[in-house]
Amino acid sequence: MAQSILIVDDERDIVSMLNQYFCKIGYVVYTAINGKEALNAITKHPDIILLDINMPDMNGFTICEKIRNFVSCPIIFLTARIEDCDKIKGFAVGGDDYVVKPFSVDELEARVAAHLRREKRHGSSAIV
């Protein structure tokens, strides 16, 4: 069964590009362009989440805090924020990785694959 990825970003170009890329290499892709959609998409039980921080209705830190209470899958922040304090906060609220825009899609794919391999070794990413 194909692994699934949830992409949460208010920049539609990024969502579209990542959607096409990950679909092409065999992932089932779910997308959300704001916090409300992201919270609804969690019910699809993605294996991994790519999460922007800067969004108009709810920032990625808040989304991560809210979903971390019932989702154990890896969360990779994908953001333009480069400050160490933002990276530290991202990990503090439950993020597993932090990738700064602009990013290499190949590197992002490698990080996604590494996190999913780790999850497979340590158990499922089921909702707890």
What are these regions (language model features)?
Residues D9, D52, T79:
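Active-site residues of response regulator receiver
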Residues R12-Y30:
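Two-component/phosphorelay signaling modules centered on CheY-like receiver
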Residues I42-P46, K66-C73, V93:
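Conserved phosphotransfer cores of two-component systems
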Residues Q3-S4, A114-V128:
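Short, Lys/Arg-enriched segments at the junction into DNA-binding effector domains
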Residues I33-N34, N59-T62, D86:
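Acidic catalytic/metal-coordinating carboxylates
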Residues T31-I48:
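Acidic, metal-coordinating helix/loop segments flanking the phosphotransfer/catalytic sites
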Residues M55:
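Receiver (REC) domain active-site loop signature in two-component systems and cognate sites
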